[in-house]
Amino acid sequence: MIQVEHKWIKEIPVLHIFDETRASEQLPTVFFYHGFQSQKELYLSYGYLLAQRGMRVILPDAAMHGERHGAESDTEQAIYFWDTVRGNIDELPQLVEALNEEGLVDMSRLAVGGFSMGAITSYGMLAQYEWLKVGVCLAGSSYYEHFARALADGVAKQGMEFPYDVDERINELAPYDLSAQPTKLKNRPLMIWHGKEDDVVPFAYSEKLYEALVEEDMSDNVAFMVDEKAKHKITIEGMLAAVGFLEEKL
């Protein structure tokens, strides 16, 4: 039977999903991240399907989201979007360490994945942590600087003011920007899924990254899936492909 356990790890609320018959085993583990203005519970389908296939799954809530959502307005969530992404990236080692101390994870078989903001998060994690084995990025962008400037322009056009220096904040994203250093992927398995009609995170970002990886001779382990009609919403086919990719590569 698949178990869903709500717990707090290092003050981070997560859903922990696993097969109860293997509850105490060191299992391959997937950290899967939700999208902007969403929450961990909406991604339980991924956790269930992956746990059926023998993986341990951790669904965290990002800062300002889910159980970590305080009095922040929609505007504040938008203004601090990249702080939320960086928070996810910086918190990952804490989650891994805590689970390893409990003897629950196979440290040689760790993966990250996510949709939209979760995919953006996952790209940054792959740029930061060589110990991650697999990544699944659904409707995201690895082009941190370019996308950050586009988002900032959109926020400014709505009359919102930033309580910080935008250029300085964007410059701070450089270490997480996989597009600027694609060789950091180091031929690790990566699945990229994107809908061509995406009106939130442009499809061009995924296409451009794949082309860059091809140019660097690093596309052998990359699965690039394109949905010709999808907007900013993962399809059933995309979800099942992501689960199958993680099962195969992890």
Identify the function of each model-found stretch.
Residues L49-S73:
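Conserved alpha/beta-hydrolase
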Residues H146-E207, E211:
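The feature captures the conserved acid-bearing segment of alpha/beta-hydrolase catalytic domains
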Residues E25-G35:
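Short beta-strand element of the alpha/beta-hydrolase
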Residues M1-E25:
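N-terminal cap/lid segment of alpha/beta-hydrolase-fold proteins
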Residues E207-L250:
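C-terminal catalytic histidine-bearing segment of alpha/beta-hydrolase fold enzymes
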Residues F36-Y48:
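The serine-hydrolase catalytic nucleophile loop
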Residues A78-E102:
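Alpha/beta-hydrolase active-site loop
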Residues L95-G154:
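Primarily recognizes the serine-hydrolase "nucleophile elbow" in alpha/beta-hydrolase
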